[in-house]
């Protein structure tokens, strides 16, 4: 019975700051695993550690343009959100995935400088 209930509880995907704040507000003990996508064994290890040590765990997927020397490299960065989500949804007890847009991360910033 517990197994069936655990399968029915799925991770929630959050797409903006407003929903992120509203969703996380009730929780005090939250583990956070930031990524630029390309979910791999290292990420999965960090996520599992967070799940063990925190009441709730959130993974972010955000390709940060500030981490690239030029816009061309940023535009060529291989992003595959569907693949990342298919990997993440297999991780039991992962609560949330946050996939912000540029303006959610860099609010009030007129220009990004490297």
Give the location of each predicted region:
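Nucleotidyltransferase catalytic core that binds NTPs
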Residues: 2-114
